[in-house]
A protein has these predicted regions:
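Solvent-exposed beta-strand/loop surfaces of large extracellular or lumenal domains
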Residues: 396-417
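Glycan-recognition and catalytic regions of carbohydrate-active enzymes
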Residues: 322-369, 402-406
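Conserved, mostly hydrophobic/aromatic
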Residues: 128, 203, 230, 312, ...
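Aromatic- and carboxylate-enriched substrate-binding clefts and catalytic-loop regions
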Residues: 139-302
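C-terminal beta-strand-rich structural cap/linker in extracellular carbohydrate-active enzymes
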Residues: 412-438
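An acidic-aromatic substrate-binding cleft motif
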Residues: 63-135
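N-terminal accessory beta-strand-rich subdomains and adjacent acidic, glycine-rich linkers
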Residues: 1-89
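Carbohydrate-binding surface patches
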Residues: 353-390, 430-433
Length: 438
């Protein structure tokens, strides 16, 4: 109900509402030169606002306004599968070649142990190679590397070269304050490219005024010219422009595992886990950084829930949060090794309820992966396998009743149309991998 929204408080969009027997999500698309749009309740109305530029702004020359759009759907499956916000953005320039853009899984050190140390990098690349993952992210801290006469750039090139020798490419974290102008963007990213990186994670971006929204476009053009994959962090929400710039594989603009972290005394409310797939994810991929297994960071969630996050929260460049120590030799190492990050088909399971439970079927080629994340209340859900073509080998990961940092694993044969019933703990989850055998 509108009355549950605090009056005068700016809301990030898409904003999703249940209307009658259907759903409406309100958002914006193709925002390049306007300030980012917020929404605010005034009485019984929802109005547009501009939190970053409340006094307005002056435009000289051409004015390019974004689209204000409403996605209307009969059910959550129709809502999630809408391409409206993306299709309202211009297609990529046909003269531009994006064949070099490669999605993949990313190992990452900062969440589990903060600033990466120069002398520790080889073991992380070794672990990424053992997992069969495509990338390793060198996060904040590399700027202070030094060894003998080598400065940070020489140290960076050394570890990137080591990663290449193991078949693992590198994505590099940078602070946006290093490149505020177009010339600074080019010069700084040229150094990153020269060091051998194939991608960039740009952090601490200022509030989304019209000037900063134009800065995003400059960054996208420069990363394209240098053939660097792009991930914006600490940033504005997406507005569908991945259609224009396919090398922007993901961006943050979401409360993911960097919010849910004990060293900052922050815990993700469980209902939010089942809200974001039907709000923020409608605008584009989210760098949620899923799948923490270390027991001290579960904070009420379960291992199956954490694994399911990587299926429910889509990101063509998926940075897995935890240390490799919790992935290698885990009961689901094979699933982590094989899990796709791009999908050919998505089905929202009918038992899904915004804020309570989210269940997704994702197809990649001939395989189906099912992920379920549960909210604050234990529940039992059922779904059928009518999407299968015949029989399949199912690998099932479910909650263990007595422990968060554990799971139940089962291998079985299932058939098309079979009904599956799942008991979910509070903060629990469920994963099923299906491989055709007919």
């Amino acid at each position: 109900m509108l009355q549950n929204i605090p009056a005068g408080e700016a809301l990030v969009n898409p904003l999703t509402a249940v209307v009658g027997n259907g759903y409406v999500a309100v958002g914006e698309a193709d925002c390049r030169t306007f300030a980012d749009m917020g929404l605010v309740r005034e009485g019984n109305l929802i109005r547009v606002c501009f939190p970053a530029s409340p006094e307005g702004w002056t435009v000289e020359g051409e004015l390019l306004s974004p689209w204000r759009a409403a996605i209307v759907a009969d059910d959550l499956n129709g809502l999630v599968n809408s391409d409206l916000l993306t299709n309202l953005c211009p297609a990529s320039d046909p003269s531009r070649n994006f064949d070099w853009v490669k999605p993949g899984r990313v190992l990452w050190q900062w969440w589990s142990s903060e600033a990466p140390k120069f002398e520790e990098q080889q073991v992380w690349y070794d672990a990424a190679a053992r997992l069969g993952w495509e990338y390793y992210l060198i996060d904040d801290g590399w700027r202070f590397w030094k060894e003998g006469d080598k400065d940070q750039w020489q140290c960076l090139k050394e570890v990137i070269d080591y990663g290449k020798s193991k078949g693992v490419q590198s994505v590099i974290w940078v602070d946006s304050k290093e490149m505020r102008t177009r010339a600074e963007i080019h010069d700084y990213l040229a150094k990153v490219k020269e060091a051998g990186a194939v991608g960039i994670k740009i952090d601490f971006i200022p509030a989304p005024t019209p000037e900063i929204m134009r800065w995003y476009q400059d960054a996208l053009e420069e990363t394209y010219d240098l053939q660097l994959l792009c991930n914006f962090h600490g940033c504005v929400k997406p507005s569908g422009l991945r259609r224009t710039w396919p090398h922007e594989l993901t961006r943050e603009a979401v409360r993911g595992h960097e919010f849910h972290i004990s060293r900052y005394d922050r815990v993700m409310p469980m209902n939010q886990e089942a809200i974001k797939p039907f709000t923020r994810l409608l605008a584009g991929p989210a760098d949620f950084t899923p799948t923490a297994f270390v027991p001290s960071e579960l904070l009420g969630y379960t291992w199956p829930h954490e694994l399911a996050q990587a299926i429910v929260y889509t990101s063509p460049l998926t940075h897995f949060a935890d240390s490799y120590k919790w992935y290698l030799n885990s009961p689901v190492e094979d699933l982590l090794r094989d899990m796709p990050v791009v999908w050919d088909e998505t089905i929202v399971l009918p038992f899904s309820e915004i804020g309570r439970v989210a269940g997704f079927v994702r197809r990649h080629g001939n395989e189906y992966w099912i992920g379920v994340v549960n909210g604050e209340d234990a529940r039992t859900v059922s779904f059928d396998l009518g999407f299968l073509q015949g029989r399949a080998l199912a690998t099932v990961i479910s909650d263990r009743p007595e422990a968060d940092d554990a799971l139940v694993r089962e291998e079985k044969i299932v058939d098309r149309g079979e009904t599956i019933t799942v008991s979910l703990r509070k903060g629990g989850g469920y994963v099923m991998r299906l491989r055709s055998i007919d």
